[in-house]
Regions:
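Active-site SXXK
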Residues: 8, 34-59, 85, 143-147, ...
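Mid-domain, small-residue-enriched loop/turn segments at the edges of structured enzyme/sensor domains
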Residues: 70-71, 102-142
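A penicillin-recognizing enzyme superfamily signal
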Residues: 1-4, 13-14, 20-29, 136-142, ...
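Conserved catalytic neighborhood of penicillin-recognizing serine enzymes
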Residues: 53-106, 167-196
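Extracytoplasmic/periplasmic, Sec-exported soluble proteins
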Residues: 2, 30-39, 51, 74-78, ...
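Flexible loop/turn segments at secondary-structure boundaries
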Residues: 9-11, 18-21, 66-67, 93-94, ...
Length: 237
């Protein structure tokens, strides 16, 4: 999915692989999947910044008694600055920080970002993308558009305007109304950390030559073999 973060207008999408099927299932819009670690900036780091944390705030990187989680390589450092936890997509600091700011704060902020959460999602798995029903690529793209445009949510849409044969306007999204979700300062601080994903983090191998991009990677483990993944996400701007 490619969309304009300043309007929510979808510029392009691939709905499925293989031959075109008329009115076939569109994975980009209708598929509900766990977003993996791409949820961390939404449910943990953005609300933490809003609560007064800074990119260089020190986070605990160690096992916790209230939720069983581990980092992707099975190691931990004890303490790490937030910007490193974001770039390296560390799981333990994300869970610890969600506990520090409070489940309600992370849950409510993620809903403000447009994620279709239910009460069943209000647990520590929210820090790692473990959702009851999941979300779609289109919703996640619009959520990251909030970081790209300075803090405002614009709902993703495919149609800009419809005028019927009588000249009546049926749909008009030429000037869509956005909703403020985070402050401009928070969006800028989040972007500064998401740049690290491609400069020295989990997205280094995907860093495009001669372009500067910010974003986040995400992987969901297979329930049958934890060494393999079901989905691999990349969201960038």
């Amino acid at each position: 999915v490619a969309l304009d973060p300043n309007t929510g207008g979808i510029q392009g999408l691939i709905g499925r692989r293989g031959e075109y099927t008329f009115r076939g299932f569109n994975c980009a819009i209708s598929m509900q999947r766990s977003p993996g670690a791409t949820i961390k900036p939404i449910s943990v780091y953005a609300p933490a910044l809003e609560a007064g944390y800074k990119p260089d705030s020190i986070l605990k990187d160690e096992p916790q008694s209230y939720y069983e989680a581990k980092n992707f390589d099975g190691t931990y450092q004890g303490e790490v600055p937030m910007y490193e936890a974001v770039a390296q997509s560390l799981n333990l600091p994300a869970v610890w920080l969600l506990n520090e700011i409070g489940l309600n704060k992370g849950f409510n902020k993620a809903k403000e970002f447009g994620l279709p959460l239910t009460e069943a999602d209000k647990y520590y798995g929210l820090a790692l993308g473990g959702l009851e029903h999941g979300t779609s690529p289109a919703v996640m793209a619009s959520a990251y558009g909030i970081f790209a445009n300075g803090g405002t949510l614009y709902s993703p849409h495919l149609i800009t305007k419809i005028i019927d044969s009588t000249g009546a306007v049926i749909v008009d999204k030429t000037q869509p109304k956005g909703k403020r979700v985070i402050s401009k300062e928070t969006s800028e601080e989040m972007t500064s950390m998401l740049l690290g994903t491609f400069s020295n983090g989990t997205g280094m191998s995907a860093d495009p030559y001669n372009y500067t991009i910010a974003g986040k990677t995400g992987t969901t483990e297979s329930s049958f073999d934890t060494t393999k993944s079901n989905d691999q996400w990349m969201i960038a701007y």
